[in-house]
Amino acid sequence: MSEQLFPIRVRATAPKPFGNSADLAEVAIGEDGMDYAVKTVHIAASEALCYQIYAACGIAVPHKATLLMIDGSYAFGSRIERGLSDYASCAPTEKSEWLKECSPIISSICALDFLIANEDRHMGNFLFFTGLNGRKSCMALDFSRALLYASWPLPDTWKLHNNTTSTEKGLRQLHFWDSAAATQSLLSAAAIKQSTWANWIDALPTGWITAGFETTLSTWWGSNDFQKRLQDCLSAVK
């Protein structure tokens, strides 16, 4: 664990604007003029590590930063992306089209959610956008109910009733589930080196991970337990 070399200093904070976000502490205005959704302590660690995993697997996520709060503590900041749409704001006639075109990405995200025990991948935890060439795409956000939120060893998320499995089943019912994309995302995660994972953990601010658990978490990636979980996830996403 470490002190942060280049955190973004927070100039002011405001109450969270998203009434249905149980894990969002508040919104911070950084010295860079941007707004950030603030997550603290173990939630901050889960968010930071999951952002690294998903980005390494080619999944778009919002810009992230370590925030130096007004009280001197460190928090995780996910930049609030303007001009993007959540699923609820999509026109009803367009929702199926968005789902179909984004299905490879959504399937990939859900597969990784299984791996890191994210139980809360509902349709409100995607941001949708249109690229320059008119293609539809999406990014993943909110990993508050993943990794360090769950019990340890991690539960078999894909076997349980939760928002993530509901999203997966919904895609399957619509025949939009992309097993090839889901499989590839898991193989991409498997290619992340244990040393890289350990470096990500070591770079977190002191106090974000419970004392004594850092070694357990650091050595988990690539372990026998991890490999078994990976194989179970590969079977689940077929």
Task: Name each model feature, range by range.
Residues 62-64, 86-89, 101-105, 152, ...:
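Glycine-rich loops and low-complexity Gly/Arg-rich segments
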Residues 91-93:
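Amphipathic, charge-rich alpha-helical segments that serve as recognition/docking helices
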Residues 68-71, 108-111, 168-176:
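Short C-terminal domain-edge/linker segments immediately following a structured domain
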Residues 1-89, 113-118:
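Conserved ATP-binding subdomain of kinase catalytic cores across diverse folds
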Residues 83-87, 121-125, 184-190:
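A general structural signal for short secondary-structure boundary/capping elements
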Residues 96-152:
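Conserved kinase catalytic-core segment
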Residues 41, 136-238:
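C-terminal catalytic region of ATP-dependent kinase domains
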